[in-house]
Each structure stands twice: as structure tokens, then as C-alpha cells.
Design a protein with these regions (language model features):
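Acidic, His/Gly-rich catalytic cores of divalent-metal-dependent hydrolytic chemistry
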Residues: 138-239
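Active-site neighborhood of divalent metal-dependent phosphoester bond hydrolases
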Residues: 16, 28-112, 123, 132-149
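N-terminal active-site segment of His-dependent metallophosphoesterases
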Residues: 1-38
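Short, glycine/charged-enriched secondary-structure capping and boundary segments
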Residues: 5-8, 34-37, 65-68, 130-131, ...
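Residue-level marker for buried hydrophobic side chains located in beta-strands
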Residues: 19-21, 51-52, 115, 159, ...
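A short acidic-Thr-Gly-centered motif at the start of a beta-strand
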Residues: 8-12, 42-44, 107-111, 149-151, ...
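Active-site environment of divalent metal-dependent phosphoester hydrolases
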Residues: 1-2, 27-30, 57-61, 109, ...
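Divalent metal-coordination and catalytic microenvironments
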Residues: 24, 54-55, 118, 162, ...
Length: 239
């Protein structure tokens, strides 16, 4: 499983790593039960594992509430029904609910000079002024500029997902990263990508899902699109 492989690389490279997930935890892959297991095991071992809220986390929570109110799985949307079924059969539904409840309570996580947010921000309003809805759902309409093209770095480094790209995006200002998008389409056969803030380094593992929508090609190993001011080190690995 890609998530577990990526975690193993991150733990090997930085034994004290704080792990922050970009959301959409349980409905983007075939084994949500293994995601629960991985998070639970890391926490049991003393690791700090957190997640910001993604739009699919909200959808899953809404589906769980409907299911609790009497809706059958057949009445729910397919992705959410599948996740609930797998989690329930594996005995992981209660733990998943707990993780999901924590996740949807956080629209961003902020540190010294950086913040993690699922979708993005309104560059005119900044991180503090952007609504929770936009932080989760911010995405350019087809043919429109991405929000990060107008971002000047005033809120520091922003690490985001939500908008799948064929390659990881690192946008720089004066040589320093100001936006990193790590959504590289793992659900579509691309890559699962992480970013190490301290080392300005991308870590990537190849998806095991069928390639579609143009994903599946090996990304460049130097400066990806949108990157400027120097190369970005990447680690790509095929299963």
C-alpha cells in the first residue's frame, strides 16, 4: 500500500518526523482500514500524526450521519458506502470515526513560517481571512488561474493538496518555497507525495492504482513545473 510505503520512507529518513496529512483520508483508496491501522500504530508508538480536513472527509462524515439515521449503504454515494463497508468489516469503523472527527475540526495546521491546508487560500484575504469552506475547497475552475499564481508568500510556506497535478509543484520566491502542492494523483495512478519542510525535499512513491486521466508517467526528478529558484530533490520509487 502506497501510504504505508511512504510512511516507512519518511520514518527511516527522519525518525522524529511529525506527520501532517492533507485530508481525504478514507475514500481515495481501496483499503481505508489499513490507513486507520497505520495512523493508530504510529500514534501508539509515540508519533505525532495529524490531518487537516479535506472535502472528502466532510462527505464521508455526512454519509456516516445518514447511515446512523437509518440510510442503507445502497442509498449512499458509492465511494462513501464502499469505505464504510470496508471499515465496518475490518472492525475499524469506530477508530475511523474518531480520526475523522479530529480531522474535520482542523481546516489548517500552522507552524513557524509554514501552514498546511487542504485546498488553499484567497491570496487577497490571506490565511486568516480565508473562510473555512475555501480553505477546504479552493480550486481554480478549468481554464482559470490557480490561486497560488497570485500568492506573494505573506503567510509563509503553504503546503496543499486537492488539485491533482501530474508532477509535484514547488513555487518559490527569492529561492525559498512559498507553495508546495503534493497532490500527484495517486488515486488515478500517479504518485503519493510527501514534503519534508526542514529539508525542502519531496518524497514520492508510485501508485498501485490503474492509470487514468493522463496520470502514471514518471515525473521529472529535478525542478517540477511551477518550480523556480533551484532544483527540488525528489525520491521516486516503483513498487
Amino acid at each position: 500500500m502506497e501510504f504505508i510505503e511512504l510512511l516507512e520512507i519518511a520514518r527511516r529518513d527522519r525518525v522524529d518526523a511529525r506527520i501532517i496529512l492533507l485530508g481525504d483520508l478514507f475514500t481515495k483508496g481501496p483499503r481505508p482500514d489499513l490507513v486507520v491501522e497505520a495512523i493508530s500504530e504510529l500514534r501508539a508508538g509515540g508519533r505525532r500524526v495529524e490531518s487537516v480536513c479535506g472535502n472528502h472527509d466532510l462527505r464521508l462524515m455526512d454519509a456516516l450521519r445518514k447511515h446512523d439515521a437509518g440510510a442503507s449503504l445502497d442509498e449512499l454515494t458509492p465511494a462513501e458506502a464502499y469505505a464504510i463497508r470496508v471499515l465496518d468489516r475490518a472492525g475499524k469503523l469506530t477508530a475511523a470515526r474518531r480520526i475523522l472527527t479530529e480531522t474535520i475540526s482542523k481546516t489548517y495546521i500552522q507552524g513557524a513560517g509554514w501552514a498546511v491546508v487542504h485546498g488553499g487560500i484567497d491570496p487577497q484575504l490571506g490565511l486568516a481571512g480565508t473562510s473555512d469552506f475555501e480553505k477546504i475547497h479552493k480550486k481554480a475552475a478549468p481554464g482559470r488561474p490557480h490561486w497560488w499564481e497570485s500568492y506573494n508568500g505573506d503567510d509563509g510556506l503553504l503546503i496543499v493538496g486537492h488539485k491533482p497535478l501530474f508532477e509535484p509543484m514547488v513555487l518559490r520566491r527569492d529561492g525559498n518555497p512559498i507553495v508546495v502542492n503534493v497532490d500527484t494523483g495517486c488515486a488515478y495512478g500517479g504518485f503519493l507525495t510527501a514534503y519534508c519542510i526542514e529539508e525542502d525535499r519531496l518524497i514520492m512513491v508510485a501508485s498501485q492504482q490503474p492509470a487514468r486521466d493522463g496520470f502514471g508517467a514518471t515525473p521529472v526528478a529535478t525542478a517540477p513545473r511551477w518550480a523556480s529558484g533551484g532544483p527540488v530533490r525528489t525520491f521516486a520509487r516503483r513498487p
